[in-house]
Curated annotation (Swiss-Prot):
SUPFAM superfamilies: S-adenosyl-L-methionine-dependent methyltransferases (SSF53335). Its main location: cytoplasm. The gene is rlmL. NCBIfam families: PRK11783.1. It holds the Pfam family RlmL_1st. GO terms for molecular function: 23S rRNA (guanine(2445)-N(2))-methyltransferase activity; RNA binding; rRNA (guanine-N2-)-methyltransferase activity; rRNA (guanine-N7-)-methyltransferase activity. SMART domains: THUMP. Specifically methylates the guanine in position 2445 (m2G2445) and the guanine in position 2069 (m7G2069) of 23S rRNA. The keyword Cell inner membrane does not apply. It is an enzyme of class 2 (transferase). Belongs to the methyltransferase superfamily. RlmKL family. This is Ribosomal RNA large subunit methyltransferase K/L. Residues 43-154 form the THUMP domain.
Amino acid sequence: MLNFFAAAPKGFEYSLAQELTEFGATEIKESVAGVYFTAPLTLAYRITLWTRLASRIVLVIYKGPCESAEQLYNAAYCIDWSAHFSNRNTFSIDFHGTGGFINNTQFGALKIKDAIVDRFRDDGDARPNVARIDADIKVDAHFRNGVITIAMNFSGPSLHQRGYRSTTGEAPLKENLAANMLVRSGWKAAPTTLLDPFCGSGTVLIEAALMAADIAPGLQRNRFGFEHWRRHDKATWHEIVEEAKARASLGVKRCEVKFYGSDIDSRLVALAKRNAQNAGVLELIEFNVANALNVEPPAAEGYLITNPPYGERLGSVSELLQLYYQLGDKFKKEFGGWKVAMLCSDIELISALKLKADKQMKMFNGALECAFNLYTLHAQSTRRDTPVLPEGVDIADIAPAFANRIKKNAKQFEKWAQKEGIDSYRLYDADIPEYNVAVDKYLDYVVVQEYMAPASIPEAVTKRRLSDVLLALPAAIGVDPHKIIMKTRERQKGTNQYQKLDERKLELITTEYGAKFKLNLTGYLDTGLFLDHRLTRRLVGQKSKGRRVLNLFSYTGSASVHAALGGAKSVTTVDMSNTYLAWAKENFALNNLSGKQYEFVQADCLQWIRDCNEQYDLIFIDPPTFSNSKRMEDSFDVQRDHVNLLGMLIKLLSPNGELVFSNNKRKFKMDTETLTKMKIKVQNIDDMTLPLDYKRNPHIHNTWLITHADK
């Protein structure tokens, strides 16, 4: 009997152990990401050819304690390597694990390599050569918890590579993952009609057809790890392969199970057909180009097993939620009598099905943890957490309180925005506490920002509520799901103030009281325009005529644009970020503003204020609540440091000048007593600067008009 370890993705251990038991292996023991077993050579060959779940099978040669480099060397040296391969063969070492005396895997691999070479030499043979690529013999070594396992790669390249895939589609599903889906769903135990409406390159259907037609998954592989092993029994292996070929030929002819696959992408369907042809099962599968929402059940009952689209692509969340919701509705109405098994990494999407799962399991698609849910669809299958919707009922009814509120807001603000001369505004700001989001409209796009939920609310609850918001929006306000962009806003912390989100850009031009501004809806958490400061910017513009204007912490320079359009004599725009200064220059260009009177300065604003000797007639400053940027020498806290800041700024203010000071700290308290002693006059102007669309959130910012006290 020989000792083996069958490696597999995490979550496969139970299924793999069952498969090995069915093969007739003994001493089966589940481990992390694999299963140990014993088998005679003939059975090991058969398992290697027929396993549908294992990624790799290794022959365990040594396993024992290892607490030093010397012990590691001795463990490898004690093996009679010449009994396993010739010195004419090349070999490589694949070492996994660190800890204790092993600081890196290269050190461990080198020790084993030295031991192998020395053992050949000491036995009177020439040393074999190491080959980094395509070695004849691959030695696998694993070090964990003071135990070293030394093995030989028996199966060769990863067993999920069946040999039938020509090229992969986007986000391909590994073959052994598809096989495990078929096993855990219960389909393999009782093969029946199978449908995959998101078939992609056909992996689930092809793996199922291989099972139903009794075709060995390794039959088309042209390389195995044992081929250069000295104990390899070519005659026995040939006999096993020939037997598998005969079974495959007969199995295809006898197979009565029906397979149906479709995908909306014709290129993927063509690829699926090529893969099925390569696998020898094309005649068993009916492929079509179709939208999954239009696919009808091909039989009264069967299995629908699929891996629908999911992912984190910014802007796609609402579209995907709509898809999943409609899928759940279709399953409920049209697939009574069917079983559904679905693999998805996003619990929000799964919850959008609104169906109760019979069983929920975890599987890994590569490094991505996924949910694998099983559903039984009865003729009167009902949705979970929501009543069955009668035909024609608005989808927004899944979150009626939210839908009704935002519909009402949209009706109110649309007329107001047209009258104001703006096309970007806030529609909803956590009006209903359960739906803790902000919804902003930018032309015909909508940006949804999720606020950080209290720790007392379970994550599943917040995700479900967010899912309902995104599902309700299209019908509630008439927005295209493609044009809903999802962002997550957390409590502002230092340099996260302008957090970069995505390299891709979705840029628009918005209009505000005659000024034009560039927006980037996907590149950053913020879009380039703080909507709550709309009236503050207009106020700056109204006060700018003939004045020297300074804009500090300028961001994308929108207040500077209003100042310039308002007739400012000069405008100086200061920000620490070159990116935002470049953006500010673009905004000036959009408004046909150019000239030497417009200056853009990249600098630490606090240091720039200390060094400045100029005076200005109008200063606008909207500093961060807190900042500890690497470019700043000291941290800044607006509550702690505002008196010192205003004391420096008042020196830059001309005798009749005005300073507009704003910040977003909700519990900010102006130290008027100290400022009065400094002969600084402060006047709160929140009522003047709070737009109608932010009246529900009066603490969104604090704004003050500041002058010299003797004026």
